[in-house]
A protein has these predicted regions:
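C-terminal catalytic/acceptor-binding lobe
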Residues: 3, 154-357
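Short beta-strand-to-loop acidic/aromatic patch adjacent to the donor-nucleotide binding site
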Residues: 60-71
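Conserved catalytic core of nucleotide-sugar-dependent glycosyltransferases
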Residues: 73-152
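Active-site nucleotide-sugar/metal-binding loop of Leloir-type enzymes
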Residues: 50-62
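Short, acidic, metal-binding catalytic loop of nucleotide-sugar glycosyltransferases
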Residues: 3-8, 27-36
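Hydrophobic targeting segments
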Residues: 9-16, 36-39, 69
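A short, glycine-/small-residue-rich helix N-cap motif at loop->alpha-helix starts
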Residues: 42-49
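Short, well-formed alpha-helical segments that are part of the catalytic scaffolds
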Residues: 15-33
């Protein structure tokens, strides 16, 4: 596999360490054995921002910026090299938090079997991003002093201005690992390794209508492309998605959800959970028109994307979802819903564990 000018891809890494994160950054650097790594102490000034993005070795074809407060995939460096080999001229994002509207677009891509998504507008998060070396240097120079715009928004703007594709991986290669209540990655699979050909498969363009969940109240909504608006997207009331086997879907949702401890935790919890399960159903129905995951890694990414749907979106609407036991119950329940819903779509009574959706 070659990157630029026939060279095999080589990635340098800058680890950003805020005050108090120095030891975490050192530990992360030790885990990235075999990569060119340096640690950048960050601050509020634009100089610290630019330092992290400025390439610092001539031996690299691409440059990655990582936050110190992450847990990397055990084979992060090897998988990034394979991904870069498949998409050498793109900006690549390897973490998408499971609570944003972009995560729902990413789930659609995963359910259809795609490794990459051209996301719906900017995502403020940018804790694991790779740029080709020339673009990384240009991006480092492009941020004006005193600009407090979120880095992910700046990256999106930069990519659009330079005609650079900014792609989000449906398989996350890092997980947040710091204090505080943060949404999990959309699909972090530390025990699974993508085959090299995975990263060379097609990219899904974010569709103009994405079923999503409102973060504050857990209600189903539609995230829609609206030309002429500032970022091109707006929240709208939920749109009906044509649903074959509607009664079977409803029965599965009620059977799986209404008996859970989380559903019984307070007055609105059951209704909220049913609404979120309806979003999963709608996403699966839309994705089925574009494809389905292959056996093995693609199916694992899709299953994990479903398992995190409620975890990423219900922390405010259903307090029990924040407890470890509640989160574990929701993960298990939504993974089971995914299996049963995909079985309905295929017309079989129930799939074997790990079967191809």
């Amino acid at each position: 596999v070659s990157a630029q000018g026939g060279e095999p891809p080589t990635v340098s890494v800058s680890i950003r360490a805020a005050s108090g994160q120095e030891r975490r950054a050192e530990q992360l650097a030790e885990q990235l054995d075999g990569a060119f790594v340096r640690i950048c102490r960050t601050g509020a000034d634009a100089g610290a921002f630019a330092e992290a993005w400025q390439p610092w070795t001539r031996r690299a074809t691409h440059h990655m910026v990582l936050d110190a407060a992450v847990r990397p995939h055990p084979r992060l460096v090897a998988q990034v090299h394979e991904a870069v080999g498949g998409r050498p001229r793109a900006a690549l994002r390897f973490f998408t938090p499971g609570d944003g509207y972009a995560s729902h677009a990413l789930r659609l891509a995963a359910f259809a079997g795609y490794p990459w998504l051209l996301p719906p507008g900017p995502d403020p998060t940018s804790i694991a991003v790779v740029l080709p070396i020339p673009e990384a240097a240009e991006f480092a120079r492009s941020v004006p002093a005193g600009d407090d715009t979120p880095e992910g928004v700046l990256l999106q703007r930069f990519a659009e201005e330079r005609g650079l594709a900014l792609l989000a991986s449906t398989a996350d290669l890092v997980q947040r690992d710091g204090p505080g209540a943060h949404a999990p990655a959309t699909a972090f699979l530390p025990a699974a390794v993508a085959p090299a050909e995975w990263w060379r498969q097609d990219t899904l363009q974010a569709p103009p209508l994405i079923p999503v969940v409102h973060l504050r109240d857990g209600q189903p909504l539609s995230y829609e492309a609206v030309p002429g608006t500032s970022d091109g997207w707006r929240l709208r009331p939920r749109r009906d998605v044509p649903t074959p086997h509607a009664r079977r879907f409803a029965r599965v949702m009620h059977e799986r959800l209404l008996g859970t401890e989380v559903a019984r935790s307070h007055l609105r919890a059951a209704a909220v959970l049913l609404g979120v399960a309806g979003v999963l159903r709608d996403q699966l129905l839309l994705a089925a028109a574009w494809g389905r995951p292959s056996e093995g890694f693609g199916a694992a990414v899709a299953r994990e994307s479903a398992a995190t749907l409620a975890l990423g979106t219900l922390a405010e609407a259903v307090p029990a979802a924040r407890r470890p036991d509640g989160a574990a119950e929701l993960r298990e329940t939504f993974e089971a819903l995914y299996e049963e819903m995909t079985a309905i779509l295929r017309g079989s009574p129930r799939p074997e564990r790990g079967a191809d959706p």
